[in-house]
Amino acid sequence: MNYLFYCEKSIPEYIKHTINCVLSVDRDAIINVCSDEKINFKNVNTLNLSEIATEDTKKILNSNLDEKRSIARIFYLHDAMRELRLKNFVHFDNDVLIYKPFSSLKNVFMENRLNITKSSNAKIIFGYSYINSDEVLIKLKEKIS
């Protein structure tokens, strides 16, 4: 499974624990970190945010939206998905540890839907999310912008 991590500015020190946890639990894990800072971990790919940012993403970054940091994450994840030509990926906050491989959870996720942790009925958080279609992020971006 593809795992995408997003680090807006600097890469937090604790992310190495999260990455090691994923690699030890999910033998099929492919780890990609999206950040402007290079990460030097074995078996981890880095995508430079400024290099993959589309015009839509840059517009969000230059906007006056209150939640532009959270919204930018969604846009960057979509940029990374396209850059890497991924059909699906798992994404969660950098301080989340997982204890099961994706293969043992995949049956609970719905196809062509936003599979994401809900804080409430009105608010979503990236505690754990599974994106299984480019269209899911396109629709979400259209609602946001």
Predicted regions and their residues:
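Low-complexity, flexible helical/coil segments
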Residues: 39-41, 64, 77, 126-131
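GT-A fold catalytic core of metal-dependent nucleotide-sugar glycosyltransferases
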Residues: 69-115
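Generic structural signal for short, flexible, solvent-exposed coil/loop and linker residues
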Residues: 20, 85, 118-120
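A short, glycine-/small-residue-rich helix N-cap motif at loop->alpha-helix starts
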Residues: 14, 65-72
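Glycogenin-like
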Residues: 1-8, 97-145
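N-terminal anchoring/stem segment of glycosyltransferases
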Residues: 1-61, 82, 134-135
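Intervening/peripheral non-core polypeptide segments
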Residues: 62-65, 95
